Amino acid sequence: YLVNPAGYAALGAYMFLLILIGFPVNFLTLYVTLEHKKLRTPLNYILLNLAVADLFMVLGGFTTTMYTSMHGYFVLGRLGCNLEGFFATLGGEIALWSLVVLAIERWIVGLKPIRNFRFTEDHAIMGLAFSWVMALSCAVPPLAGWLRYIPEGIQGSCGVDYYTRAEGFNNESFVIYMFTVHFLIPLSVIFFCYGRLLCAVKEAAAAQQESETTQRAEKEVSRMVVIMVIGFLVCWLPYASVAWWIFCNQGSDFGPIFMTLPSFFAKRPAIYNPMIYICMNKQFRHCMI
C-alpha cells in the first residue's frame, strides 16, 4: 500500500458514490431527451453528447477505479490500465470539445456574425463529429506508442504519463501537444466566445433590439452553458496545473496523494453536468415529470 488502507477504502466509497449518482442521472438525461420529440433540438444534441461522455467515464473509468481501490493497487495489468486511461481521457475530452461547440453556437446566436444563420441539426451533427475526432486524437495516441497510460497517484487509476521521460514514447512532445491543442486552445476559444457574447448581450439589452422573451430565453441557455464551463474549469484546472508542474519538475519529491486528489476531484463533472442541465432546463424538467 502506498497510503493507509483506509485511504483506498475512502477512494472506493467515493467512486461508488459517483457511480451511484452519475449513471442514473446521465442515463435519465439520454432517455428523457430521446423519448420526447420536442427535446430533440440541435442544441440538445450537444448536451446529450456531454451525457454520453459522462457515461464513458462512469462505465469505463469509475467502475475500474472502484475495483482496483478494493485491492490497494492497479490489479488489471497493462490492458486494463490502457482501457481505463483511454475511457477517462476520451470522456474528459469529449466534454471539453462539446463545451467548445456550445460556446461557438452561443456566440453565433448572440452576435449573428453570419446573417440569417440558423443552428440546425446538420450543424449539431458536425459539432458532435468534431468533438469526437478531437477527443480521439488525444485519447488514442498513448495506445499507439506516443506517450503511454500508467497507474498514477496511489495507483488506483491510470492516466497520461506526465511523470517520466521514458525512452521510445516521446512523452515531452505529446504532453506539449496535449496541453496546447487539447487544453489551452479550446479554453481560449471558449473565453473568446463568451467574452464577445457578454458584450453583445449588454448592447442588445441597452438597445432593446430583441423582444424581452427572446432575450430571456437566450440568457437562460447561455447561463446554463457558462455554469457548465465554470464547473469544468473548477474540476479540471487543479489536475492540469498539478500535471504540468510534475512534467516541468520531474525528479522532484512529491507524495502519491499530491496527484491523486486533483485526479479524483476532476471526475465530478460526470455528476454535475446532467444536474445543471436538469435544474436549469424547465422544458426538460416538465418532460421528466
UniProtKB/Swiss-Prot annotation:
Disulphides: C81-C158
Segments crossing the lipid bilayer: 8-32, 45-67, 82-104, 124-144, 174-195, 224-245, 258-279
UniProt keyword annotations, A-Z: Cell projection, Chromophore, Disulfide bond, G-protein coupled receptor, Glycoprotein, Lipoprotein, Membrane, Palmitate, Phosphoprotein, Photoreceptor protein, Receptor, Retinal protein, Sensory transduction, Transducer, Transmembrane, Transmembrane helix, Vision
InterPro entries in the record: GPCR_opsins (IPR050125), GPCR_Rhodpsn (IPR000276), GPCR_Rhodpsn_7TM (IPR017452), Opsin (IPR001760), Retinal_BS (IPR027430), Rhodopsin (IPR000732)
Superkingdom of source: Eukaryota
Residues of this chain annotated as glycosylated in UniProt: N171
Gene Ontology cellular component terms for the protein in this record: membrane; photoreceptor disc membrane; plasma membrane
PTM sites of type N6-(retinylidene)lysine: K267
Posttranslational modification: Phosphorylated on some or all of the serine and threonine residues present in the C-terminal region. Contains one covalently linked retinal chromophore.
Chain location of the short sequence motif 'Ionic lock' involved in activated form stabilization per the record: 105-107
Membrane topology: Multi-pass membrane protein
Extracellular side stretches: 1-7, 68-81, 145-173, 246-257
GO biological process: absorption of visible light; G protein-coupled opsin signaling pathway; visual perception
PROSITE patterns: G_PROTEIN_RECEP_F1_2, OPSIN
Site feature (Plays an important role in the conformation switch to the active conformation) residues: E84
Location within or outside the cell: Membrane; Cell projection, Cilium, Photoreceptor outer segment
A molecular function (GO) term: 11-cis retinal binding
Location, primary (coarse class): membrane
Entry function: Photoreceptor required for image-forming vision at low light intensity. While most salt water fish species use retinal as chromophore, most freshwater fish use 3-dehydroretinal, or a mixture of retinal and 3-dehydroretinal. Light-induced isomerization of 11-cis to all-trans retinal triggers a conformational change that activates signaling via G-proteins. Subsequent receptor phosphorylation mediates displacement of the bound G-protein alpha subunit by arrestin and terminates signaling.
Protein name: Rhodopsin
Organism field: Limnocottus pallidus (Ray-finned fish)
Taxonomic lineage of the native organism: Eukaryota, Metazoa, Chordata, Craniata, Vertebrata
Gene designation per UniProt: rho
